Amino acid sequence: MSSVTMRDMLKAGVHFGHQTRYWNPKMNTYIFGARNKIHIINLEQTLPLFNDAMAFLNKLAASNNKILFVGTKRAAQKAVSEEAQRCGMPYVDHRWLGGMLTNWKTIRQSIKRYRELEAQFQDGTFDKLTKKEALMRKREMDKLERSIGGIKDMGGLPDALFVIDVDHEDIALQEARKLGIPVVAVVDTNSNPDGVDYVIPGNDDAIRAIQLYVKAAADVILEGKQYAQNQTGGESEFVEVADEAAGEKAEG
């Protein structure tokens, strides 16, 4: 399971919240105090909650479930796309398109179109077109790549969302809630934790903190996938194996 320590979190600045005047009272329980008008998050609360969230992601991956990484703010884009790809999970790292979950049928058509354009680009079809037509198709393909390239292999609705910054990704959260899809999210002191199934109280702005969250998530997902590969029985069997292994690691 996750090997992230409190020292790692301190180094990454996970404990730095927002300016005190921007706080959300619903985050009060996770706040240690304030320093220079900046709220300090209580890492003694964050660490166990973070571990719970990682255990949940691990269990999902061990059952061959899909976890959609969501981080469209500039500080999160690179880490989200790189780590999601590393663990073979879908991701959204640019603008969240309204209806990405609730209007999946339409999104699926866009994915189909993107695949067609990708195939045409690769098999030389673009070369046979007029320069203007080829340019138009290339632009269309690039636009689709930015918006849905990360979910082209998702194949259906995800089993959970892993979100950086719930304020920034409020539409994604609303859609997940509407469909009953569990949400794991990093929630800063200025945000509302309501509707998040696994709250990770922490800095959602610092690149190092974001890298820590998504790298740990990718690591536990890869572990879960490995359990799934190694198992020979049914679903419940390998979930138990994942739990046992997590327990052994915690004890060791």
Swiss-Prot record:
UniProt feature coiled coil, ranges: none
Report a single Gene Ontology molecular function: structural constituent of ribosome
What PROSITE patterns does the database record attribute to this sequence? RIBOSOMAL_S2_1, RIBOSOMAL_S2_2
Tell me the SUPFAM superfamilies matching this sequence: Ribosomal protein S2
Which terms under GO biological process does the entry name?
Answer: translation
Name the source's superkingdom: Bacteria
List keywords of the entry alphabetically. Answer: Ribonucleoprotein, Ribosomal protein
CDD domains, sorted: RPS2
Q: Which GO terms describe its cellular component?
A: cytosolic small ribosomal subunit
| Pfam families per the UniProt record, alphabetical | Ribosomal_S2
InterPro entries (alphabetical): Ribosomal_uS2 (IPR001865), Ribosomal_uS2_bac/mit/plastid (IPR005706), Ribosomal_uS2_CS (IPR018130), Ribosomal_uS2_flav_dom_sf (IPR023591)
**Matches recorded under NCBIfam families:** rpsB_bact
Q: Which family does it belong to?
A: Belongs to the universal ribosomal protein uS2 family.
Name of this chain's protein: Small ribosomal subunit protein uS2
The protein's organism comes out as Alcanivorax borkumensis (strain ATCC 700651 / DSM 11573 / NCIMB 13689 / SK2)
Upper classification of the organism = Bacteria, Pseudomonadati, Pseudomonadota, Gammaproteobacteria, Oceanospirillales
